[in-house]
């Protein structure tokens, strides 16, 4: 026997709809919740505070080259293991695992295309592959990008996004600092423009070599740029560091960076600079 009868029908429930993974991102600077489409429309910068998210080489290629069209070269190069290095895992295993998880083959990609109707070469680093560290393959790719620039008589853009040298390759990694720097002198000998774009982060052996050798050294806003990290420096000198130390704005104020350019202005600014440098 039913003692109580529901007078009003119960609220109907529907199956829970899962929000697609990766649809929303949180700004690291201001905490704003940003939709994927919103980020794409703003070239992965926060519309609220201007924070620049780290992006991969193919995204730089897509908005810097005319019509988002480019041709990649030297993508087949792979890291060797000259030291048979082992930390928590063998170096070849770490590279293989990173390739499988990220879908990337190395911490640097090279591409040719046109910018403003003229040929250009871009070599871009990727922090998502072992911290964007520079090993022998990255050094070789950057050197070949310089060679391609000479071959095409086209301006070169190097986009840095790296924690520094790749410790798993030891001295072979450090040698890339001299190798890339020497190769870039060929552009200066032929009056071919070379612009270095520093993004967050540009650290260690990268900042101590080619990242600071451009005809113009430009940066995205608030990029971390330096050799050793702030904590290491503070612990060494036993003093507090100035506000904003090693950020792009601080370096520009002290003459180490020529220009800070928002990502939305980057393409047109680079085209303008190339025309100026070409005379």
Swiss-Prot record:
GO terms for cellular component: acetyl-CoA carboxylase complex. It is found in: Cytoplasm. It is an enzyme of class 2 (transferase). One of its GO terms (molecular function) is carboxyl- or carbamoyltransferase activity. Its EC number is 2.1.3.15. InterPro entries: AcCoA_carboxyl_beta, Acetyl_CoA_COase_Trfase_b_su, ClpP/crotonase-like_dom_sf, COA_CT_N, Znf-ACC. The keyword Zinc-finger applies. Residues 23-279 form the CoA carboxyltransferase N-terminal domain. Pathway: Lipid metabolism; malonyl-CoA biosynthesis; malonyl-CoA from acetyl-CoA: step 1/1. Keywords: ATP-binding, Cytoplasm, Fatty acid biosynthesis, Fatty acid metabolism, Lipid biosynthesis, Lipid metabolism, Metal-binding, Nucleotide-binding, Transferase, Zinc, Zinc-finger. Pfam families: Carboxyl_trans (PF01039), Zn_ribbon_ACC (PF17848). Its cofactor is Zn(2+). A zinc finger (C4-type) spans 27-49. It comes from the Bacteria. PROSITE patterns: COA_CT_NTER. Zn(2+) binds at residues 27, 30, 46, 49. GO terms for biological process: fatty acid biosynthetic process; malonyl-CoA biosynthetic process. It catalyses: N(6)-carboxybiotinyl-L-lysyl-[protein] + acetyl-CoA = N(6)-biotinyl-L-lysyl-[protein] + malonyl-CoA. Binds 1 zinc ion per subunit. Component of the acetyl coenzyme A carboxylase (ACC) complex. Biotin carboxylase (BC) catalyzes the carboxylation of biotin on its carrier protein (BCCP) and then the CO(2) group is transferred by the transcarboxylase to acetyl-CoA to form malonyl-CoA. Belongs to the AccD/PCCB family. PANTHER family: ACETYL-COENZYME A CARBOXYLASE CARBOXYL TRANSFERASE SUBUNIT BETA, CHLOROPLASTIC (PTHR42995:SF5). Acetyl-CoA carboxylase is a heterohexamer composed of biotin carboxyl carrier protein (AccB), biotin carboxylase (AccC) and two subunits each of ACCase subunit alpha (AccA) and ACCase subunit beta (AccD). HAMAP family: AcetylCoA_CT_beta. This is Acetyl-coenzyme A carboxylase carboxyl transferase subunit beta. The lineage of its organism: Bacteria, Pseudomonadati, Chlorobiota, Chlorobiia, Chlorobiales.
């Amino acid at each position: 026997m039913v003692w109580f009868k529901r007078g009003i029908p119960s609220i109907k429930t529907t199956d829970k709809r899962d929000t697609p993974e990766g649809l929303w991102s949180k700004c690291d600077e201001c905490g704003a919740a940003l939709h994927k489409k919103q980020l794409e429309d703003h070239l992965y910068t926060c519309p609220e505070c201007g924070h620049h998210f780290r992006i991969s080489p193919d995204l730089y290629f897509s908005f810097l080259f005319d019509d988002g069209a480019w041709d990649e070269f030297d993508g087949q190069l792979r890291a060797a293991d000259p030291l048979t290095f082992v930390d928590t895992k063998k170096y070849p295993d770490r590279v293989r695992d990173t390739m499988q998880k990220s879908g990337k083959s190395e911490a640097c990609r090279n591409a040719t295309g046109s910018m403003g109707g003229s040929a250009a070469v871009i070599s871009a680093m990727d922090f998502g592959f072992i911290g964007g560290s520079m090993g022998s393959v990255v050094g070789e790719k950057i050197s070949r990008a310089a060679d391609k620039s000479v071959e095409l008589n086209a301006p070169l853009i190097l986009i840095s996004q790296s924690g520094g040298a790749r410790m798993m390759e030891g001295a072979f990694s450090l040698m890339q600092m001299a190798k890339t720097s020497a190769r870039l002198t060929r552009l200066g000998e032929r009056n071919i423009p070379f612009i270095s774009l520093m993004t967050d982060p540009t650290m260690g052996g990268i900042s101590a070599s080619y990242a600071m050798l451009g005809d113009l050294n430009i940066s995205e806003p608030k990029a971390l740029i330096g050799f050793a990290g702030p904590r290491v420096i503070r612990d060494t000198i036993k003093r507090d560091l100035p506000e904003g130390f090693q950020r792009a704005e601080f370096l520009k104020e002290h003459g180490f960076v020529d220009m800070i350019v928002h990502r939305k202005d980057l393409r047109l600014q680079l085209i303008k600079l190339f025309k100026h440098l070409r005379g």
